[in-house]
A protein has these predicted regions:
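Glycine-rich nucleotide phosphate-binding loop and flanking beta-alpha elements
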Residues: 155, 173-174, 199, 280-281, ...
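Bacterial N-terminal signal peptides that target proteins for export
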Residues: 1-10
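Internal alpha/beta domain cores that form substrate/cofactor-binding pockets in large enzymes
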Residues: 248-317
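Bacterial Sec-dependent N-terminal signal peptides
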Residues: 17-39
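Bacterial N-terminal signal peptides
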Residues: 10-18
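Active-site metal-binding motif and surrounding structural segment of the metallo-beta-lactamase
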Residues: 152-196, 267-274, 298-299
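Core dinuclear metal-dependent hydrolase active-site scaffold
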Residues: 33-161, 203-268, 280
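Non-globular, low-confidence helical/coil segments that flank catalytic cores
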Residues: 63, 70, 182, 187-191, ...
């Protein structure tokens, strides 16, 4: 694919990550009152979000790195158990937390921004729109369809009416949402995985398999997880999004361990590769190249970062 063709791909990578401010050291002023302080903090976080959304994930410059550093600072203030309590709370309680804490408010407002794009954006022929949703979740919209993969978000079920199918790479809770999965089943929409239903369900595969859903052509293979002991645990998805995208190919590897010999059913060419940030540094490079089980993508969008339900840096915190 020449450089002109690459530019035609519309990459809307809107980072929808939620951050929880667990410290309230800045909330002790008596001049503006409680509501005024919340407004001030929300405005600050909104400004940071706009700086992020107005920059390109394909261009790493001082402005973007400064913004990401600031966001990392928000995340560093959060305890994993506090964020988990938000995820698991009743809807009313979680909504109240969003209204009272501007960082959780950002988590929700960023999700709403992505939802608005999914519902209202028009994707031109020859292009595809991509949104990163929180940790390693992605939504891809084309001129004729929309799918999601590895969606883990407090309000994920709201996606169900707007996506044609859902992919789940593996059975770890930071890569799926039960409410969204059930909503997809209730709507009779495909959910592709290696575990959700037995293999009589046409979209469950524990090995190499090819699917065709609408204009999407999907290839899968099974790899080990990067944690020892989880063999044949992660499905790798290579998805050709159809002629109306210029046959844009999106490859998502979940928490794969990057052993090329297990990449037995890859696409012949990949436009965008989604690898997981690997705690065992640089192993993701094992699948880059021209050899068997390797790919040479046009773009690589590193993911599985700022996972707030994880406790340590080695776990992508």
């Amino acid at each position: 694919m020449d450089i002109i063709r690459k530019i035609q791909y519309l990459l809307f990578c809107l980072l929808a990550i939620g951050f929880v401010a667990c410290d309230d050291d800045d909330n002790n002023s008596t001049e503006t009152g409680h509501e005024g302080i919340l407004t001030q903090l929300a405005e600050e976080v909104d400004a940071t979000a706009q700086q992020l959304w107005s920059s390109s994930p394909l261009i790493v410059n001082t402005g973007r790195t400064t913004t990401l550093t600031k966001i990392q600072g928000y995340a560093d203030k959060c305890k994993d158990d506090y964020f988990i309590s938000y995820l698991n709370g009743f809807d009313q309680a979680s909504t109240s937390m969003e209204k009272c804490d501007p960082i959780i408010y950002f988590y929700r407002s960023a999700f709403d921004r992505v939802m608005d794009g999914i519902k209202n954006s028009k994707v031109e022929n020859g292009t595809a729109a991509i949104w990163l949703l929180y940790n390693m979740g992605y939504v891809v919209k084309t001129p004729s369809g929309c799918f999601a993969i590895d969606i883990s978000h407090r309000w994920a079920k709201e996606l169900a009416p707007y996506i044609d199918f859902l992919c789940v790479t593996h059975k770890h809770s930071d890569h799926y949402n039960n409410d969204l999965i059930q909503a997809m089943f209730d709507l009779g929409k495909p959910v592709l995985s290696n575990y959700l239903k037995d293999t009589t369900y046409p979209y469950t595969a524990k090995g190499d398999k090819d699917y065709e859903i609408g204009k999407f052509k999907i290839k899968t293979c099974i790899t080990d997880h990067n944690n020892a002991g989880l063999s044949n645990f992660v499905t790798v998805f290579s998805i050709d999004c159809g002629e109306d995208t210029g046959n844009f190919v999106f490859m998502h590897v979940g928490d794969s361990n990057y052993k090329p010999e297990q990449y037995t059913n890859p696409a012949s060419h990949v436009n965008v590769l989604i690898p997981r940030y690997a705690p065992n540094a640089l192993t993701e490079n094992n699948i880059l190249g021209l050899g068997a089980g390797q790919v040479e993508p046009d773009y690589v969008l590193l993911s599985h970062i700022l996972e707030l339900a994880h406790a340590g840096v080695d776990e992508s915190r």
